[in-house]
From Swiss-Prot:
Composition bias type Basic and acidic residues, residue spans: 294-304
Primary localization class, coarse: cytoplasm
HAMAP family in the cross-refs: 16SrRNA_methyltr_H
Classification via Gene3D superfamilies: Putative methyltransferase TM0872, insert domain, Vaccinia Virus protein VP39
Keywords: Cytoplasm, Methyltransferase, rRNA processing, S-adenosyl-L-methionine, Transferase
The protein, known as: Ribosomal RNA small subunit methyltransferase H
GO-annotated molecular function: rRNA (cytosine-N4-)-methyltransferase activity
Pfam family of the protein (one): Methyltransf_5
Subcellular location: Cytoplasm
Species of the source: Vibrio atlanticus (strain LGP32) (Vibrio splendidus (strain Mel32))
Statement: the UniProt record of this protein carries the keyword S-adenosyl-L-methionine: yes
Source organism, top-level taxon: Bacteria
Gene that specifies this protein: rsmH
Amino acid sequence: MTEAFKHISVLLNESIDGLAIKPDGTYIDGTFGRGGHSRTILSKLGENGRLFSIDRDPQAIAEAQKIDDPRFTIIHGPFSGMAEYAERYDLVGQVDGVLLDLGVSSPQLDDAERGFSFMKDGPLDMRMDPTTGIPVSQWLVEADLDDITWVIREFGEDKHARRIAKGIIAYQENEENEPLTRTGQLAKLISDVAPKSFKEKKHPATRAFQAFRIYINSELEEIDTALKGAASILAPQGRISVISFHSLEDRMVKRFIRKESQGPQVPHGLPLTEEQIKALGSADLKPIGKAIKPSKDEVDENTRSRSSVLRIAEKL
């Protein structure tokens, strides 16, 4: 890994401690990235421990293949396939811990050719796995005003969503303009159409770029499926540690843990026998502690950790 694309794992010790690693346990790192969390988990495992790591980014897979360790298995695919992978390796009900480090990694942001950053000019792509799906540039050509507005508002929580969407549509309808294929073009376009007051707080393209990335990679659907999959494959007392980086992700994780810790909700006064109530099932998880945020020292060392939140839950 080059120094330029170095990745600093966020909340590393806290997330690993949250898994309560057993030396002979079986663990899944749903987001290998550049291997910071995976390597730390391996360092805590004994010779009978096992780690399965997942990533859909081919560059992450290439990095993972450098690990020569019989206890380690890398799986190329989305973490939404976690339950399927667990069945493939006969792990259902035997996994002692799952770690999910959500969002985009520093190497993905720093590599202009991946098209994630509005700070560096590159192809307007944003796919976690460039071998599947379509790039943002193609989607913007095919989308209409309402589509673009909805994505920016829903996944970027940007109050200027329609204004930005109108700017994008107007740009593309002007035949004198070059096709919108570069991150630099899109960042400038958004900056040009954003209100002046909006520009003073942070780069006006921040939320729109986040929105397009989340949408093009189906990130929220992936997270929802991965959380359900993780809960279904954990052994009793198995742990799940989830690091999120923006409010949409954290709300999903928080609500999932809350829902799974409450069990089925039976309307008050509904005439059910004790056997019928038992048949509905019970709580599946319990939250461990409160949400954890990075220390001031970590934020000073890695400003990208500033918005991160760690939540931990245990299988009942």
